[in-house]
Structure formats: structure tokens, C-alpha cells
UniProtKB/Swiss-Prot annotation:
SUPFAM superfamilies (UniProt xref): Ferredoxin reductase-like, C-terminal NADP-linked domain, Riboflavin synthase domain-like
Protein name: NADH-cytochrome b5 reductase-like
A Pfam family recorded for this sequence: Oxidored-like
Oxidoreductase-like domain segment(s): 19-55
Source domain of life: Eukaryota
Length: 315
């Protein structure tokens, strides 16, 4: 009977049941991660083909999602427990996840993670950048904006403290080194502020880093500006300046006095970018993060302002 069972296990049908399933487009976050979910699929498919050819199922064994807190892994989704959720605006949350003991997440400033969610039996993945300091111990935080028709938004809005969420990473091609640039020009729209936060904090936390920083945050209204207290605190450092561009407000009269002189109205366009570049105290290197349309437009404006393609990075 045992021999018959082993023969049944080696039938074509049995092997086809073990064949990896190709991911749906919704399972790709679209941020250019390496390894991408499709890279992992092709890896697992090659492993399956080798196992089938040799009739050796042990070759199929690979990393699976870990159900308890563990070290972050770019190939394996790891569960982290939600320990706090703060609503920053009507549609945006700051979510804190626990790390085991006093461990650190292990990301370099500006790197991002991939979140996996399941809604209506459909698996989806999206990229988010932690906003907590790179050296934060025992936790990490992410900034998540929810959209009315977004699948991941439905998943995030179902979260409660004590729930777990699955992440993998880190990913990202920008690596900041102290004093690497004379000045950083940080241009962010909405939640594109996220990768700028740990980069900025790593500079101000390091008394030996003398990099100048000019941060420009683009938002619809004053109320929609994220992390106001943090940004105000950062602007007190001798080497940091912050500016804001509000697209749906037209007057500074209703703004707090501390924002009136550093807020522009309308959109971040070519003229303002030329002014920002010319006002930099040292030769700037620009970091840009926002929607695809925003990053494309800003890249064009930076070139018109005299920067070269190797003088900016698009997240």
C-alpha cells in the first residue's frame, strides 16, 4: 500500500497541485522591488520544475510567511503586531508596529517595505516607507493614506490595535551617507513626505553631519499637512529649512504666523523650483517623492533649473 501511495503522489495531477500559482497584477506593488513578487514566483517555479524532474519533493521547501515576530526578510512576509493607530487627517493614519524586544527594524533611511493584504479573497501588495527613526528600538511606524475606493485602504481601515499585518523588505536604491552632499533639496507631495522623514532625522540626530536641508512639502490645505510638530521641530535646527506649497488655499491670513512666510500657494512649478535651487546654500542634490505625475514634472523642472540627471533621485 505504501508503494502505491508513493506512486499516486508522483502522478502528473499530484505535481500540478504543487505548481506555484502565478501572481495577479494586484499582487505587485509596482515600486520596482527586488525581489519582486514575480521574481519570487519564477524562483519557486524553477524549484518546482527541478523537483518534478527529479521526483524529489524536498526540493520544494522554501521560506514561508512567518506567523510570529521575527527578523525582516525581503523574500518572506513576516507578521508584526499593531500597537498604536493615530489618525493624522481624515484619511491618513500613523500606525506603529511592535518589534521583538528592543530590536531595530534594520532599514537604512529612505528604504521601504511591502505590505500584504487580503480583501475579498484577493491578495494585494503595496509599498510604504517607515517614518520612524532608523535607530528606533522595539517599534517602527508607517504613514498610510486611505482612498475611498482603494482595496488596501479597506484592509488598513479594518485594523485594530492587537491585529497583525505582514511585511517584507527592505527595498530601495537610495542610501544616504552623512555629509555625502552639500545640501539636500527634499521635494515631497502628500505621503511622499514619508521617505524624507527618516533621512532628515538621521541628519539632525548626527551632530557631525553638517548637510544643509531644504524640505518642501506639497499639500492641498494647511489641515492636510502631515507631522506638523515634527517638521516644526526639525526647522529649528541651524541647517534645516522647511517650506510648504498649498494647492487649495490662496491666502496666508488664516495660517499660523510661523507658517505665513514659508508657505506658497498654487502648485510647485518651474519658477518656484528655480528659486529654491538658486537659494540653496550649497550645490544641491534633490530627492523627489510623490505621485508618478508629480515626480515626472519635478524632474523636468529640476533639469530646467540647471541640475543634471545625476543630481536628483526619484523615489
Amino acid at each position: 500500500m505504501m508503494a502505491e501511495r508513493e506512486e499516486d503522489d508522483d502522478t502528473e495531477e499530484a505535481w500540478m497541485q504543487l505548481r506555484p500559482t502565478e501572481p495577479l497584477p494586484s499582487q505587485c506593488c509596482g515600486s520596482g522591488c527586488s525581489p519582486c513578487v514575480f521574481d519570487l514566483y519564477h524562483r519557486d517555479l524553477a524549484r518546482w520544475e527541478a523537483a518534478q524532474a527529479s521526483k524529489d519533493r524536498s526540493l520544494l521547501r522554501g521560506p514561508e510567511s512567518q506567523s510570529c515576530p521575527s527578523k525582516l526578510n525581503p523574500e518572506t512576509f513576516v507578521a508584526f503586531c499593531i500597537i498604536a493607530m493615530d489618525r493624522l487627517t481624515k484619511d491618513t493614519y500613523r500606525v506603529r508596529f511592535a518589534l521583538p524586544g528592543n530590536s531595530q527594524l534594520g532599514l537604512r533611511p529612505g528604504q521601504h517595505l511591502i505590505l500584504r493584504g487580503i480583501v475579498d479573497d484577493l491578495e494585494i501588495q503595496r509599498a510604504y516607507t517607515p517614518i520612524s527613526p532608523a535607530n528606533a528600538e522595539g517599534y517602527f511606524e508607517v504613514l498610510i493614506k486611505c482612498y475611498q475606493m482603494g482595496l488596501m485602504s479597506r484592509y488598513v481601515e479594518s485594523w485594530r490595535v492587537g491585529d497583525t499585518a505582514f511585511w517584507r523588505g527592505p527595498f530601495g536604491d537610495f542610501f544616504y551617507k552623512p555629509n555625502q552632499y552639500g545640501e539636500l533639496l527634499l521635494l515631497a507631495a502628500g505621503t511622499g513626505l514619508a521617505p524624507m522623514v527618516p533621512i532628515l532625522q538621521s541628519i539632525t540626530d548626527n551632530e557631525n553631519d553638517e548637510t544643509f536641508v531644504t524640505l518642501v512639502g506639497c499639500f492641498k490645505t494647511f489641515e492636510s499637512i502631515y507631522l506638523k510638530t515634527f517638521l516644526q521641530e526639525q526647522a529649528r535646527f541651524w541647517n534645516v529649512r522647511t517650506f510648504f506649497v498649498l494647492s487649495q488655499e490662496s491666502s496666508s491670513e488664516q495660517l499660523p504666523w510661523s507658517y505665513q512666510e514659508k508657505t506658497h500657494f498654487g502648485h510647485l512649478g518651474q519658477d518656484l523650483i528655480k528659486e529654491l535651487v538658486s537659494c540653496c546654500r550649497r550645490k544641491p542634490f534633490a530627492l523627489v517623492c510623490g505621485s508618478a505625475e508629480f515626480t515626472k514634472d519635478i524632474a523636468r523642472c529640476l533639469l530646467c533649473a540647471g541640475l543634471t540627471e545625476d543630481s536628483y533621485f526619484l523615489f
